[in-house]
């Protein structure tokens, strides 16, 4: 994205930053709806091998599309440069901000340290203690539960 093309820099950067996250959530929403519509059919008995593999393929395609798009949205909204979350904070902050300078310079190191913390804690303690993993797992679980609840109101079963 070339910010020089924006008439209003802050609004343009905010729109671009939120577009990716919102698109991920919309794709997850639509795929979860299709999966919920097909849920009972996917788990019904199939005498034909072709139908069985079609159901298998659709279940994994739609299920992973839901989960991956939720995870992508949650990862992209982290306030680390150059992710979308940083751009959102940048749009609402003053231009010469110490936090923004710090994050531009050290975000890569911070993200690497957070991910390595997960690998080290998993290797030594058998538990992934990475804040990024915990955040995505918990908040992603809440979003998935909300989708299950929503489709349950319509009498649909979201098999995730």
Label the predicted regions.
Residues 1-160:
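Hydrophobic transmembrane alpha-helices and their immediate loop junctions
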């Amino acid at each position: 994205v070339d910010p020089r093309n924006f008439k209003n820099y802050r609004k343009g950067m905010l729109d671009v930053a939120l577009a990716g996250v919102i698109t991920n959530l919309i794709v997850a929403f639509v795929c979860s709806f299709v999966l919920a519509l097909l849920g009972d059919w996917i788990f019904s008995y199939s005498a034909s091998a072709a139908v069985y593999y079609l159901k298998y393929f659709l279940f994994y395609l739609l299920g992973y599309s839901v989960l991956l798009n939720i995870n992508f949205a949650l990862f992209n909204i982290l306030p680390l440069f150059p992710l979308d979350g940083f751009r959102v904070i940048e749009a609402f902050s003053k231009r010469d901000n110490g936090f923004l300078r710090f994050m531009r310079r050290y975000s890569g190191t911070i993200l690497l340290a957070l991910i390595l913390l997960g690998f080290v804690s998993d290797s030594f303690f058998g538990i992934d203690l990475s804040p990024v993993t915990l955040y995505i797992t918990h908040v992603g679980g809440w979003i998935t539960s909300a989708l299950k609840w929503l489709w349950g109101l319509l009498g649909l079963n979201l098999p995730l």
